[in-house]
Structure formats: structure tokens, C-alpha cells
Amino acid sequence: MKRKLFWICAVAMGMSAFPSFMTQATPATQPLINAEPAVAAQTEQNPQVGQVMPGVQGADAPVVAQNGPSRDVKLTFAQIAPPPGSMVLRGINPNGSIEFGMRSDEVVTKAMLNLEYTPSPSLLPVQSQLKVYLNDELMGVLPVTKEQLGKKTLAQMPINPLFITDFNRVRLEFVGHYQDVCENPASTTLWLDVGRSSGLDLTYQTLNVKNDLSHFPVPFFDPRDNRTNTLPMVFAGAPDVGLQQASAIVASWFGSRSGWRGQNFPVLYNQLPDRNAIVFATNDKRPDFLRDHPAVKAPVIEMINHPQNPYVKLLVVFGRDDKDLLQAAKGIAQGNILFRGESVVVNEVKPLLPRKPYDAPNWVRTDRPVTFGELKTYEEQLQSSGLEPAAINVSLNLPPDLYLMRSTGIDMDINYRYTMPPVKDSSRMDISLNNQFLQSFNLSSKQEANRLLLRIPVLQGLLDGKTDVSIPALKLGATNQLRFDFEYMNPMPGGSVDNCITFQPVQNHVVIGDDSTIDFSKYYHFIPMPDLRAFANAGFPFSRMADLSQTITVMPKTPNEAQMETLLNTVGFIGAQTGFPAINLTVTDDGSTIQGKDADIMIIGGIPDKLKDDKQIDLLVQATESWVKTPMRQTPFPGIVPDESDRAAETQSTLTSSGAMAAVIGFQSPYNDQRSVIALLADSPRGYEMLNDAVNDSGKRATMFGSVAVIRESGINSLRVGDVYYVGHLPWFERLWYALANHPILLAVLAVLAVLAAISVILLAWVLWRLLRIISRRRLNPDNE
């Protein structure tokens, strides 16, 4: 009886669940992300599998607000694919990919992949094809037809927006065949070239997100957005020194987050921005659009809607005075992990430990060996797979003043694992630094030749090796790329049609251990100055202290928007190099206060009167008039350091022009011989526009070197002119070697003299030793005299 009741209950429950199951199987109405009334999705009949029809979407687009603003974006492979932007897909390396992100306050409503490719004329039609994946979901297949062989082909592939997430990878997989039997996947006839003009057409729609600081820094900076972070800064009017310092802290923090993307901080005085922005306001001095906002009683950070556009957000930094704004800015830079709700009050930001020189988070540590695990920027960076595994790259950002001239090499202890080659052959690991080959190591095919054996069973087995490598130090700069290439001699099928040898190729796996180390702790800090290349590449000398605690910035009394923009862009750029905000930067508008200061000086707008007559200055820009000193001999390349006589100023030329010009100059501080001055000058609004563009553009910064960089409409020209001074410390013997390094004849003479002196010392010691033995013998045996 109990068994019957059990089965009756089971049948009843099954019947009740059946309608629910049927309901879930039908297309469901998509919910609106911004919580507005839902709109039922329009269903379409799915296209036939295998067909690629322009304009046909594989699934319904996400449902979003009808009145939300949208933007159309074209991302070409030249922008988002690995350099040079084009891809050559081959039989043994059939995959290529591009990556793009989607901001958290946007959604993609339409996506189309436009491909321009050329297939090899040797391919078999139809059997050869190009498969397109989005986040490992197959989007479609493009068969290679007879008419396409050897010709440039244009194709469109609709991308299903439902599969687009915060981070996306479009992968192209080439399936190539050139004969029916006995194929060699390494054949040079198996290729398909994808042009760099291929791209993605995306339509983004903005979402009306909630004012919630728990997501900060989103939407003011979104790490999913690969574009330059353009973030306007709004003031009621020309800011005073305290407000300049507060805004510089905020800009440098956003710069530290932007990193390689770049940053730009347009400045507005009492104007509404047209995009997400930062607004600085006090109870007494605020932009007109905040005139009705209640007064505050403490430093407050609040996220509000744009008065005219709810899709645009404003981060308002409020305070009773500039002191409050400074505290709020430090709260953004150091306390943002506690942000939540629409607003927060910054009660206190108390420093606990002072920063030390060269401790910038983005720089490789120079006080101890560093593991490769500390240098990783994403989880799988130190591993690779494939018949020909892709190169493993590690970035090394170093202080520009690291003295490496007499170094015999930098110790690097590498632990690596790799798939064992099936036979002893020429498979190897090549190590390169900045595209310069360093050393090569054979990949052993015998387990006993390696110290460790990985216990996890993998195809063909993984071997473990340990190698010490010495890096030639003179090849290092401020920014370096260390590359590991694993080159395998993969056995390939062969034979004839009647006697064909075939097998399934097996992928190779390579790993550089996280516990591998590199050691820069044994080197001095010493650099000849002025060197604008050190400033352009690493923000040096200001970045020596990551918090800019030993930097003084001299601003005009009443800076205009362009001058404020130069300040914010410069400290933002330095923050991007160091990875740390300028929380202890000093800003002044009185040039007389820098006298006697033990600090590096950044000048924006104009040289203070007391410095204009300094003989170290090699260029000056004042309104329409400018003058410059030119050297005896100019070197065209940044890496070539001229002799002191070649750098000597030969001529000073003064010109007057209505054309725009800007300049960056460097010279020794007259107040401390270990300190430097970097001045960013311009003669007009257009000049400041070119100056800011140069500061924000890494390509233009790369052309800056020497002591003078002149910025004109035609580009940037740099000069090495004037005296050289040295910053840092070397022991006396290293300093002597450095002084003689460029004088080989004198060095040879001194070397000969040193050898003669050594021989003389040895002879003198031998004579003294003989004399002492004679004296000792006579003292002990006076009868033998």
C-alpha cells in the first residue's frame, strides 16, 4: 500500500512539474538591465547552420532602453590585433585572435565582423575553411571556394551580442588542406593571410547606471575599456594652489589606473562637461550648476547625475575649503576601497609609513631579487601551448638611473618546464631582451638530464629544467621586454601516396616557473643629466619618489585651462609610470619659495624671473619671442651620447613669430647640484594644445631626449646642448672608471702605469722581505756575520 501511495505521489509531482518545464523551453522575455518596464524580445527564425548571410544575426540582440544613447565603433585589426595587425594562419599555427572589452555601463546591441583575407592558391576548396569563435562559441564558418584561391576576399560574419561579455576574444581558426592524403601540416602552401584592415563594427548602448560608489572608479575609469581614459576636471574658476594640489592627486591616481591606455584630463572653468567628469567645489566657490547643492560640513565625495543627461555621471569632490578638498583627494587615492553608496565622508587619511626611493609599484624592485610571479600582469602569462608555442613575454620597468656600465651581467635564475621532445634533436629555448638575442638552451629528451620531473601526466610528458642566465646589462633601458621562445622540431608526416605515414600532431606545453628570479639589487643609481628621455620614458627624476614627495611644481599665479591641463596630464603620466598617486606633491605659485629647496622642480607656464638668467637654460619661450642655444655637433639618435665638446653651445638664436610653439627643457637646479629642473613651456593656447598632446602621446614622447625638446606643428626636435651634471652616487673607483670610459688612450696609459706600479710594489715588497730575512738571520746567528 505504501509503495502504491509513493508512485501515485511521484506521478502527481511529475505532472505538476511538466507545464513548468514546457514554459522554460519557450523563448523568455529578456529583463531590462536598467530596471525599466520589460520589452518582449522579437524572435527570429534561426539561419541555417553553415550559412553566412550579411545582416543576419545569430540570435536576438539584448533588450535595452529604447531612448538610451548609442555609439557606433569600428575596431580594426590594426588597432586591436597583435603587431603588426595582420595575421598569417598556417597549418601548424592555425589560430589568431583579437581582444576587446565592453564597459560595465554599456551593452553591445549589434556586432559585425568584417574580414579581409587571402587564402593560399594551393588549398582544396570547401575542405579548407575559416572558423570564427567568440569566447570559444562558434559564430560561423567561412568555406574557401575555388573563386577565392589566391585572391583577396571580403566577408562579413554577424556576431551574436548575447555572447559578448566584459572581456572578449574573437578567435579565427584556419582549417587548411592541400591534398586528400599524406598531408604535411607544416607545408608552406598551407596559409591564409588576414589583412590588418579587417575589423569589428560594434554598436554600444549606454545604460542608466545607479549612483553607487561601491563600483568606483567605474564609470569614471573602466579597466574593460581599452581606449585612452579622457576624464574632464571641472573647477568654478582658476584654482588656487591648494585646489591645484588636490586635483593633481586625483589626476595622478587615475593615471596610475590607466597605465598603458593613456590618460587625458581636459579642464573646464564653470562649464558643464559632456561626459563623465570630476568636479571640485567648496561651499563658497562652486560651478553654477551646483549652486543649489547643500553646503557640506566635511570632505565629501558624491556621485550625481549630470543635470541635463542622466546617462552621464559626475564625481563631485566637496569641501568647506581647500584643506577639505585635499583630504578628499587623498581619500580617493588611498581609501577608495571603502567607497559605497551615493556619497562618502572622508574623516581622516593618516600616513603610517613613508615612501622610499625607487619603490614605485610599477618598477622592478632593486632592493632584493624579484620573482617572475611578481612581474605577471595576468594569470596565464608565463605559459604557452601549441605545436609552435607562442613566445612568453615579461615586462621589466626599471629606474632610468640604474648604473649598469661595468656590470658583467644581471643574474636570472629560471625554472622552466616543457613537453619532452620525442627524440634528441635541435629543439631549444631562446632568450631575447628587447628583440636582441641573448642565449639558447637545448630542450632535453631524457628525463635524467633534468633536475625535476613533473608528476602530472601530460601528453609526451613534461620535463623540468633550471638554468642560470646572465643578461648583458648594457642592453637594458627604462622599459624592457624579456622574451622566451620555445622552438620545437616537430616530426611531420611524409611518404608517398602509396606508402603514406600519418599521425596526429600533439601540442607542446611550456611553462616559466613563478619562482624564477631576476636580481637588480647589486647596482648603484647614477645618471648623467639633463636627460629628457628619462623624463619621457619614466617621469624621472620626479618618479624617484613615487609619491612625488621630493617634487615642487611651480605654476602661474592665475593658471588658465590649458596650463592646468598641462599640470594634470603631466602628473597623470608620471602616475601611469610609477603606479602610485602623487599624494605628497608640493605646488606653489611663488617662484621665490623654491630657493634653497632640496627638491626636483617642475615648471609649467613660464620660467620664474630669478631663473631666467641662469646660464644652464638652453631655450626660452616668451609670447611670440623665443631663443635657443645650438650645440657644436648634433647627434640624430637618442642612444648616441656626444662628447662634452660636441655638446658645447655654439650659437644662441632669437626669433619672433606668430606661429605656435612649445618646448620641454631640462637643466640643473641652481639650488642643489643633485637636483634637476624640468620646464614645460608654450607660447599660446595652440602651443599648450601641442604640449599636452606630446605629453599624452607615447610615440611623441619617444622622440624626446637631451636637454631641449622643441614641439612644433611639424613634430618634435630634440637637442643635446650645454653642460652635463651627474645625479646619484658612485664609489671613487667607479667614478674614475666612468670618467675614463670615453678616453681609451688615457685609460690605456693609466692601465700601463697601474701595471708598472703593481710591479714596483711587488719588487719593493720582495726587496723588503729579503732585507728582513737577512736582518733576522744576523740577529739569531751573530757568529755567522
UniProtKB/Swiss-Prot annotation:
Keyword Transmembrane helix appears in the UniProt entry: yes
Signal peptide limits: 1-25
Membrane topology field: Single-pass type I membrane protein
Parts of the chain that traverse the membrane: 745-765
UniProt entry tagged with the keyword Heme: no
Periplasmic topology ranges: 26-744
Main location as per UniProt: membrane
One GO cellular component, as annotated: plasma membrane
Domain of life: Bacteria
Record GO biological process: cellulose biosynthetic process; UDP-alpha-D-glucose metabolic process
Cysteine-cysteine disulfides: none
Record Pfam families: BcsB (PF03170)
Residue intervals annotated with topology Cytoplasmic: 766-785
Pathway, per record: Glycan metabolism; bacterial cellulose biosynthesis
UniProtKB keywords: c-di-GMP, Cell inner membrane, Cell membrane, Cellulose biosynthesis, Membrane, Signal, Transmembrane, Transmembrane helix
Gene3D superfamilies linked: Galactose-binding domain-like
Subcellular location as annotated: Cell inner membrane
Oligomeric form and interacting partners: Tightly associated with the cellulose synthase catalytic subunit.
Homology family: Belongs to the AcsB/BcsB family.
Function: Binds the cellulose synthase activator, bis-(3'-5') cyclic diguanylic acid (c-di-GMP).
This protein's name: Cyclic di-GMP-binding protein
